[in-house]
Amino acid sequence: MPGKGDAPVLPGARAVARYVRISPMKARRVVNLVRGLPAKEALTVLQFAPQAASEQVYKVLASAIANAENNERLDPDALLVSEAYVDEGPTMKRFQPRAQGRAYRIRKRTCHITVVVEAVAPAAPTKAASKKAAPAKQTTPAATESKTEGAE
């Protein structure tokens, strides 16, 4: 299935929560934390985020991971949060009585939270990474003692 500009489309899944009773600006703060992270790491970040919106975003992300696992047969450990955005939903208008018979409008904002996860192939270790992983030369205790004795 060709995508935009005939670029290869990575397998993935998405989940949408609509009419969530949180201000879109507050939800965007939380969504910006997890965009581009591996899915399991993003769940951990959301679990410990102090914002109230993190609970709703956590549920949407968990749903997207479950969709990828059950519908697309993807490995949940190889998923990446490729897209995450918050759109504005309808605003409920309420009125609060004020002094001298006036009415004050209160806007109860809602939002739509969308999270898209994609499967990524595990990156093969490069030559530079394998050199860093090689253990350093170990020196014997006798060699280090002779070096320290000569320095004194």
UniProtKB/Swiss-Prot annotation:
GO terms for biological process: translation. Pfam families: Ribosomal_L22. SUPFAM superfamilies: Ribosomal protein L22 (SSF54843). Keywords: Ribonucleoprotein, Ribosomal protein, RNA-binding, rRNA-binding. Residues 124-143 have a biased composition (Low complexity). The lineage of its organism: Bacteria, Bacillati, Actinomycetota, Actinomycetes, Micromonosporales. The keyword Nucleotidyltransferase does not apply. This protein binds specifically to 23S rRNA; its binding is stimulated by other ribosomal proteins, e.g. L4, L17, and L20. It is important during the early stages of 50S assembly. It makes multiple contacts with different domains of the 23S rRNA in the assembled 50S subunit and ribosome. The globular domain of the protein is located near the polypeptide exit tunnel on the outside of the subunit, while an extended beta-hairpin is found that lines the wall of the exit tunnel in the center of the 70S ribosome. This is Large ribosomal subunit protein uL22. InterPro entries: Ribosomal_uL22 (IPR001063), Ribosomal_uL22_bac/chlpt-type (IPR005727), Ribosomal_uL22_bac/org-type (IPR047867), Ribosomal_uL22_CS (IPR018260), Ribosomal_uL22_sf (IPR036394). Part of the 50S ribosomal subunit. GO terms for molecular function: rRNA binding; structural constituent of ribosome. GO terms for cellular component: cytosolic large ribosomal subunit. Residues 124-152 are annotated as: Disordered. Belongs to the universal ribosomal protein uL22 family.
